[in-house]
Amino acid sequence: MTRHASARTRKREWVARTQLVVLTVVLVEVGLAASVLAVPWLSAGPGPDLGVIGFRLVFNPGVAFGLGGTLPGWLIAVVTAAVITGIATYAWITVPGSPWFVRAGLAGVLAGASTNLIDRSIDGVVTDYLHTGWFPTFNLPDVFITVGAALVVLGVLRPPQSTFPPVRTAPEDR
């Protein structure tokens, strides 16, 4: 590899990783702001029902769907931090070669998990406020995690893209 190509590769890696970090930070801020705003807005009772989704304040001591609510908070926090560290390491390594939607997906997963960890570290619970009536109440960071995971799965299922031009074959003899 030439020195010029190597510099281009390093720049591409830097840009991809910067995109990951910036999008993650922005989504964390949005998720935290939504949780902070939900508490005073919904403390007096349920908010508007928009049909498919409504607003109801729930403080979740557990993890997904309230599971693990009886586990010690410190244990949930340590396991969550370990998972975030693993995903962040995977993202840092793979993002330079990943398509944009996988980068966005990894940022969503990291942001959602980090936001919920920050929220839990404040008072031992996660603030949930989105309610469907047929699904446990959840929050915007949960949406980031779900959509992000779906984007990552799409990237895994996507056929690999070759960097070489397609091979042309001669027409068959008739």
Predicted feature locations:
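Alpha-helical transmembrane bundles and membrane-interface segments of multipass inner-membrane proteins
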Residues: 1-174
